[in-house]
Amino acid sequence: VIDSGQNVVSNLISANVPPGPMRSLLADGAVAGVGGVLIFLPQIALLFFFIAVLEDCGYMARAAFVMDRLMTKLGLSGKSFVPLMSSFACAIPGVMATRVIENRRDRMVTILVAPLMSCSARLPVYILMTTAFVPPDLYLGGWVSLPEIVLFSMYLVGIVVAVPVAWLLRKTFFKGETPPFVMELPSYKWPSFRIVMARVYDRSKAFVVRAGTLIFATTILVWAAGYFPADHTELHQLQSQIENTEVTIAQLEIQNNQDEVDAANVERGKLVERMNQVSGDLIEASFLGKMGHAIEPAVRPLGWDWKIGVGVIASFPAREVIIATMGTIYSLGGDVGEDDPSLAKQLSAATHPDGTPIFNIAVACSIMVFFALCAQCAATLMVIRRETNSWRWPIFTFVYMTTLAYVGALITYQVGMLLLT
């Protein structure tokens, strides 16, 4: 619903604001920024609804008690179980759910490892890479395919890495004996609807007010980096021509003039193709493109080129943005999805200047491992800032997760290339 509403508002802006920086700022910057905040709201509200129900009926305390022995061995608390499980859907409500953990050390460790759980935003990256580059070999008598094994492995990566990270955090930054797990087990009772909804409202409002402004600002900054300083004159002219052609097509359809409709559709297709090509060129000429070229020497050992680097930088507001960015760079437009065969085809056909393919299974796995471990989610970092009341911990989270992601992607690519040769 929020996605549809975002598209409706963007279309209204496109219909009423002429092509230019203002339209792009409103449609691609402001609307995307507001959508980037609201898109998390249903997940957060739903999570807090269930947490409030479990708390009010008395089950949450028992779940924490049951899981405490296992979680303590990992350097966490039994109360860390629900926040970490929630992080598989989205790390934002997972981080916010750590409020139920009274012990500061346990809460901080849980906050810092929660983003390692593979959230739903990583799934489009996994789907695109496995669909395009992982062969559909079957195992166990045809019950399991190689893409399914790879996809499942990406979820395991975060869990496996989170265990030593949590242990190291407890041995370094958050030293101290784990206090005995003592708590009063309340009696079971039916939850109060009024109390549950009041908690959901208060916590959801806190997210929108506190983290929303920072998420919005980050989205605007990334938009500006992808828009300036390139000259968009030709792009704006093409957008105007496409809109005029669409009006002409609508008029011809009313007149039932099919031959001219077909001719106009062909002309529109050529204009769209040219617009997508220009959009890709403008990305390269933007500050974002220049950053991609600047980091290319650093990402080349991962098997990446500057285009993949741009996609990674552009995905900082949200990981799934890399799909639209790659679609724009490869002249397919920003509306392509992870299951679009044209994007997979373009990536498969992409080559380096010497003619060697850019993408293969080693590069695809390198990208997936990077996204499984990286902190490419501004919203999560902003929530960590709000929950810890310090910039130190989101910066620390970004640095340690990016380092882990880089090392993991490097090992994956280098080992993969050895196996391929």
Feature names for model-found ranges:
Residues 1-30, 34, 74, 95-110, ...:
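Extended, low-charge hydrophobic alpha-helical regions
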Residues 4, 8, 12, 61-89, ...:
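Juxtamembrane inter-helical linkers in multi-pass membrane proteins
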Residues 4, 8, 12-13, 17, ...:
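Core transmembrane alpha-helical segments of multi-pass membrane transporters/permeases
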Residues 38-54, 60, 74-134, 371-379:
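Transmembrane alpha-helix detector for multi-pass membrane proteins
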Residues 47, 114, 141-157, 161, ...:
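Alpha-helical transmembrane segments of multi-pass inner-membrane proteins
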Residues 47-52, 130-133, 154-168, 217-227, ...:
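Hydrophobic core segments of alpha-helical transmembrane domains in multi-pass membrane transport
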Residues 102, 116, 120-150, 379-390, ...:
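Transmembrane helix-loop junctions at the membrane interface of multipass transporters and ion channels
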Residues 143, 166, 170-180, 188-251, ...:
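Long hydrophobic segments that form regular secondary structure
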